[in-house]
Structure formats: C-alpha cells, structure tokens
Design a protein with these regions (language model features):
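Mature, soluble, non-transmembrane domains
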Residues: 73-182
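Primarily extracytoplasmic ectodomains and periplasmic/lumenal surface modules that are beta-strand-rich
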Residues: 33-39, 44-52, 106-109
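Hydrophobic/aromatic beta-strand elements that line small-molecule binding cavities or substrate pockets
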Residues: 26-30
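C-terminal segment of classical bacterial N-terminal signal peptides
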Residues: 14-18
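Sec-dependent N-terminal signal peptides
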Residues: 4-13
Length: 182
C-alpha cells in the first residue's frame, strides 16, 4: 500500500504543477461512500520563500491554481479515475481555503489518493505515517493502517508540517501574505 499522496497537502500537485512551493498546514479529507465523493479542504496555506525568485514562483503557481476553478481546467492524468473534479476557493478569516471535490464511480479511483478499499471487508484504509499527524474520530489504527467503515461518511485531518525543521519554519510565509505583496 502506498503512502497518503502528497496531493493532500501540496496544493499544486492536484493540478500536475511541478515545484510544490505552496502547501497547507492542515488538510481535512472527507469521503462520502454513499455519494461516491471525496472532499479535500486545505487550511493555512503557505509557501517557503528563500528569495525574490521563490516569491515570484509562488505567485505564478497560485495564478495557475486559481485558473483551475474554471470548468475547462486541465487536470493531471492521476485524477482520470474521478468522473467529476471541482475546485473552489473560499476565504475564511482572511485565509484562502481551497476545497477540491472529486466524484468517483469505482472505489479503486481512490488509490490515486493513497486510499484503499477492501470490498470483502467493506473497509477503506490509508497508511499510517507518523509524521503526517493523521487525526480522526472515525477510524481506528490497525497495525500500519488507519481503517474506516465503508458504509458511512468518514474524515481525517493531516498536519504533516507540525515538525517542520527550524530552517524551513523561518522561510515559511502565509500565502495570503505572499499574495498581498503583489
């Protein structure tokens, strides 16, 4: 089984944009098996800025992400298994909060996100990676996997940057601050 895909916390990876300079401190993933839908909400977006070039790159990447809110957006091939893909950008407490909604017709499509479905057990699972800081009230940790019942909505939150090395903490800038400087 693969690790939870970087899609969940590196915003630009949803769109096949290389150089994941924009990420989220907190990502909440909610899967609605009854509706065959997955929602991914990212909070506290930031960029690692070492130079003016990084600042410009972050702004350029954000412009690319913003363009993905249109209906004719081009999505990466890894998301081909999802029948509907929608990105919306909300503002909450002066923070930009992307919400990605994906619809699937086959649970196997979730593998692209590192979420696995066992039809015999009617359970979903994701790898337990301690540094991802996965939190949930809906699943249970069984060995190296978080396991969730496959017949009801469940969610989990990831905070993979909680233990970010100090040298990167000093370079971390909230995305709204990066964009405000334009």
């Amino acid at each position: 089984m693969e690790q939870i895909i970087i899609f969940f916390f590196a915003l630009t990876s949803f769109f096949g944009i290389e150089n994941n300079i924009i990420a989220a401190d907190k990502t909440t993933v909610t899967i609605h098996p009854q509706n065959q839908q997955i929602e991914i909400v990212q909070e506290e977006l930031f960029a690692i800025i070492r130079s003016e070039a990084d600042l410009n790159l972050a702004r350029e990447k954000w412009a690319g992400v913003s363009a993905m809110t249109t209906s004719d957006a081009t999505w990466p091939q890894a998301l081909d298994g999802f029948t509907t893909k929608t990105l919306s950008l909300a503002s909450l407490d002066s923070q930009i909060q992307p919400q990605l909604t994906l619809t699937y017709s086959d649970e196997q499509a979730l593998r692209a996100m590192g979420v696995w479905y066992d039809a015999k057990k009617k359970q979903f699972s994701v790898n337990h990676v301690p540094h991802d800081n996965l939190q949930t009230e809906d699943g249970k940790l069984v060995g190296n996997y978080w396991v969730f019942y496959g017949d009801k909505t469940f969610s989990f939150t990831l905070e993979p940057f909680k233990q970010m090395p100090e040298k990167y903490q000093q370079l971390k800038q909230p995305l709204n601050q990066v964009l405000a400087e334009i």
